[in-house]
Amino acid sequence: MINHKQSLKDLTLNELQEYFSRKGWQQFRAKQIFDWMYIQQVDSIEVMSNIPKKLRQELMENCTINDLELDSNNIYTSPTDGTIKFLSVLKDGIGVETTIMKYDYGNTVCISSQAGCNMNCVFCASTTGGKERDLSPGEMIDQVLMANKVLPGSESINNIVVMGSGEPLENYQHLIKFLKIVNDGKGLNIGMRHITVSTCGLVPEIYNLAEEELQLNLAISLHAPNDELRNKLIPLNKIYPIHELLEACQVYFQKTGRRITFEYVLIKDFNDSIDLAKELSETLTALKMPVHVNLIPFNPVEETKFTAPPSSRISDFKNNLQSNNIGVTVRKERGVDVDGACGQLRSKVMR
């Protein structure tokens, strides 16, 4: 039976205080609970020692602070780069995957925003089986907290990328609440500039996100410089073609001042030619705003026959962009030996 208790992690601090008032509980206790959840990061209401026993009992009867449970049989650490991939189980039994990537500048957690995905991008494992449902703010937050527990010793998460399973902007309201909670200075206090949200191009929601005027990083899953090619990779492009997507990106930059990153998965003999690199350079230069391109060599997925180009081809593509004054990086492959691409572990376990 699904648990219908109120998840306290679905609430901002203000909402938590309002909830306590409606329940007739002392409002200042809400801040103490917030501290226990995000500073102390406890797993149980019962251990909240500065909360009166009677209130703790009422909280346990009416509320929950655990929105997912770690599947201890599905935690994998890459011996080559330290990437950690783990699966968690939601209250309704649905699996959700999370990835921790280790860098010199800190630990980054890649969280899922949906269980599965409806976008049907042809190169992505997340779309296998479609979308089961959106994740709640608490279910997204618990992935971050679970990552802190999975990390060894005193290590913790420094950066968040919402690039796991699902299209974050399709789960817009829950995403915004998640962002506000993890950014709260009385909680996890992760700065917006340490958070990246990736979208395959839901144009109306990009405009909505621009109006929020958050200082987060926006990444666009572009993967092709023209509609003919992008239509074959991302079905959503038939609804919101590239020119509409890029117009929304310009508005986002004007509102926030934040440079946008364009992600480009390089697929051998499909979108990796020098002519396409030149076309991409022209398209991005015409935006007349700061941009960055993140080239991603295709990470093998069983569901497709795509492969990554040879390193020389990747270098040629990168060099062409750089010669046109486009900032570019090549993402280092991480977690290949632990099903590191989004959706891979969940898809394998579901089978």
From Swiss-Prot:
GO BP: any one term: rRNA base methylation
Catalytic class of the enzyme: transferase
Active site: 97 (proton acceptor), 342 (s-methylcysteine intermediate)
The reaction(s) this protein catalyses: adenosine(2503) in 23S rRNA + 2 reduced [2Fe-2S]-[ferredoxin] + 2 S-adenosyl-L-methionine = 2-methyladenosine(2503) in 23S rRNA + 5'-deoxyadenosine + L-methionine + 2 oxidized [2Fe-2S]-[ferredoxin] + S-adenosyl-L-homocysteine; adenosine(37) in tRNA + 2 reduced [2Fe-2S]-[ferredoxin] + 2 S-adenosyl-L-methionine = 2-methyladenosine(37) in tRNA + 5'-deoxyadenosine + L-methionine + 2 oxidized [2Fe-2S]-[ferredoxin] + S-adenosyl-L-homocysteine
Family: Belongs to the radical SAM superfamily. RlmN family.
Known role: Specifically methylates position 2 of adenine 2503 in 23S rRNA and position 2 of adenine 37 in tRNAs.
Cofactor: [4Fe-4S] cluster
Gene: rlmN
Residues bound to [4Fe-4S] cluster: 117, 121, 124
Name recorded for this polypeptide: Probable dual-specificity RNA methyltransferase RlmN
Organism: Natranaerobius thermophilus (strain ATCC BAA-1301 / DSM 18059 / JW/NM-WN-LF)
